[in-house]
């Protein structure tokens, strides 16, 4: 018998994570219960198409689901996200247990669609049409609680836009997320205020290219003339908000007005993720990134002038078609010059339908692997140095969850400092963790995290 319960499997970026969280909250408001994969009647796979062979990953998961749910023949599967947008009704043909395919814009309608599927066993639905404007969603966040897995809901993502108009030559996102569609200022600010009123301390603004907010090609954009710097100014000023971040930005639209806000608002965290992708101007042009290395460094220089303690992270693609050894060495030099606190780096792989998939001068796989290892080793040196430099610093940690390395006689909690570092804080057992933004002193650095002691108990 089909039960009113579900399980969500999520791949990919923070936007997918936020989509899955919203979907979970919405379904629970409708009376569905979130359960384990083995017990679920409805299995939702929120997919990503950015990395290599995404369809194969989804097909593999579907095979495992068939085995895991063999004792529940009435169960069905929902495919959501970017791979759903790409393949659409193909899933119905290959996998009979799939009854809903929901693309990027279809997520807003998915809870009602799942309700229908639960009531109509023979129904199948395809929600892969792009909408003209940002598909607004029902507010589904509940009051701040300490959940069963000892996690505090103190940080929340807020979508401010959908899609992208940049069309970098290697990127599938404009095809799977659609054209850029900014959300209305009023809806964004209202959601942020509702989250703050619910107990949220930190908000992360999300979009494929957040600093292009309001620059939609559609002149009737709901942004109504407001740009990203103006939006950040408004949200950073909201009473009760402790921390504000945004992800992901693009160097091309990084304005002086936005840079100045880092010096104006302590609420705006001293941490920025700004994808560089390559340190070679030649490769940046082939990627269609529309900025030079000098322009990127100029942004960093201005940021450090207004916020000297700012920490920077980035993305790199290694082995892009046409990348020579000299191009790669320029990328290594960019790491040594800017000293990123961390980076996400991957070997280039073709995405069908993108311009770069047709480029000649592909780099050999062995060369790509060797370069990636060299880049990651260089980055590790700077990441280690950054973490060591934090020892002795007094700061605040936003507690998130019980640490996996819980000491036997202590109450060990994990959280993040304003720079986004993972910090494990050892507290006496009797500590009341209601003081969730905790003043601490960093006492040690680990490979990927920090250890701190509380300054106030």
Curated annotation (Swiss-Prot):
Binding site for [4Fe-4S] cluster 1: 13, 48, 82
Location within or outside the cell: Cytoplasm
Domain Radical SAM core: 150-385
Cofactor comment text: Binds 2 [4Fe-4S] clusters. One cluster is coordinated with 3 cysteines and an exchangeable S-adenosyl-L-methionine.
Known catalytic reactions: N(6)-dimethylallyladenosine(37) in tRNA + (sulfur carrier)-SH + AH2 + 2 S-adenosyl-L-methionine = 2-methylsulfanyl-N(6)-dimethylallyladenosine(37) in tRNA + (sulfur carrier)-H + 5'-deoxyadenosine + L-methionine + A + S-adenosyl-L-homocysteine + 2 H(+)
Main location: cytoplasm
Superkingdom of origin: Bacteria
MF-aspect GO terms: 4 iron, 4 sulfur cluster binding; metal ion binding; N6-isopentenyladenosine methylthiotransferase activity
The MTTase N-terminal domain, residue ranges: 4-119
Keywords, ordered alphabetically: 4Fe-4S, Cytoplasm, Iron, Iron-sulfur, Metal-binding, S-adenosyl-L-methionine, Transferase, tRNA processing
InterPro entries: Elp3/MiaA/NifB-like_rSAM (IPR006638), Methylthiotransferase (IPR005839), Methylthiotransferase_CS (IPR020612), Methylthiotransferase_N (IPR013848), Methylthiotransferase_N_sf (IPR038135), MiaB_methiolase (IPR006463), rSAM (IPR007197), rSAM_horseshoe (IPR023404)
Enzyme Commission number(s): 2.8.4.3
Pfam families linked: Radical_SAM, UPF0004
Cofactors that this protein relies on: [4Fe-4S] cluster
Function summary: Catalyzes the methylthiolation of N6-(dimethylallyl)adenosine (i(6)A), leading to the formation of 2-methylthio-N6-(dimethylallyl)adenosine (ms(2)i(6)A) at position 37 in tRNAs that read codons beginning with uridine.
Family the entry assigns: Belongs to the methylthiotransferase family. MiaB subfamily.
Name of protein: tRNA-2-methylthio-N(6)-dimethylallyladenosine synthase
Species of the source: Lawsonia intracellularis (strain PHE/MN1-00)
């Amino acid at each position: 018998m089909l039960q009113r319960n579900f399980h969500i499997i999520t791949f990919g970026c923070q936007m997918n994570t936020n989509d899955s969280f919203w979907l979970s909250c919405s379904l629970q408001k409708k009376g569905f219960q979130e359960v384990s994969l083995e017990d679920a009647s409805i299995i939702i796979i929120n997919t990503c198409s950015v990395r290599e062979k995404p369809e194969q990953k989804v097909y593999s998961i579907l095979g495992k689901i068939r085995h895991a749910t063999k004792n529940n023949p009435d169960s069905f599967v929902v495919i959501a996200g970017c791979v759903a947008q790409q393949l659409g009704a193909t899933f119905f043909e290959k996998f009979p247990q799939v009854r809903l395919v929901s693309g990027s814009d279809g997520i807003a309608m998915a809870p009602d669609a799942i309700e229908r599927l639960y009531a109509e066993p023979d129904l199948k639905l395809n929600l892969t049409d792009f909408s003209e404007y940002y598909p607004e969603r029902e507010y589904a966040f509940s009051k701040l609680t300490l959940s069963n897995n000892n996690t505090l809901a103190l940080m929340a993502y807020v979508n401010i836009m959908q899609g992208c108009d940049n069309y970098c030559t290697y990127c599938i996102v404009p095809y799977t997320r659609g054209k850029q569609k900014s959300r209305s200022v009023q809806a964004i600010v209202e959601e942020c205020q509702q989250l703050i009123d619910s107990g949220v301390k930190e908000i992360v603004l999300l979009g494929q290219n957040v600093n292009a907010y309001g620059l939609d090609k559609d002149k009737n954009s709901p942004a109504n003339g407001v740009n990203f710097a103006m939006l950040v100014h408004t949200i950073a000023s909201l009473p009760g908000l402790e921390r504000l971040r945004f992800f992901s930005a693009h160097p091309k639209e990084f304005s002086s007005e936005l840079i100045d806000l880092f010096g104006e608002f302590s609420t705006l965290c001293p941490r920025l993720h700004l994808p560089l992708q390559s340190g070679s101007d030649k490769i940046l042009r082939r990627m269609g990134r529309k900025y030079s290395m000098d322009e990127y460094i100029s942004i960093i220089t201005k940021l450090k002038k207004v916020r000297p303690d700012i920490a920077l992270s980035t993305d790199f693609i290694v082995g892009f078609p046409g990348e020579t050894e000299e191009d790669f060495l320029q990328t290594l030099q960019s790491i040594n010059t800017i000293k990123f606190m961390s980076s996400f780096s991957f070997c280039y792989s073709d995405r069908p339908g993108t311009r770069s998939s047709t480029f000649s001068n592909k780099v050999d796989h062995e060369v790509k692997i060797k370069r990636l290892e060299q880049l990651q080793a260089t980055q590790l040196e700077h990441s280690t140095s950054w973490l060591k430099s934090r020892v002795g610093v007094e700061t605040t940690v936003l507690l998130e969850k019980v640490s996996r390395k819980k000491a036997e006689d202590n109450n060990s909690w994990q959280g993040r400092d304003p720079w986004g570092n993972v910090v494990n804080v050892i507290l006496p057992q009797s500590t009341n963790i209601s003081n969730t933004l905790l003043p601490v002193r960093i006492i040690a650095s680990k490979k990927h995290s920090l250890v701190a002691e509380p300054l106030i108990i």
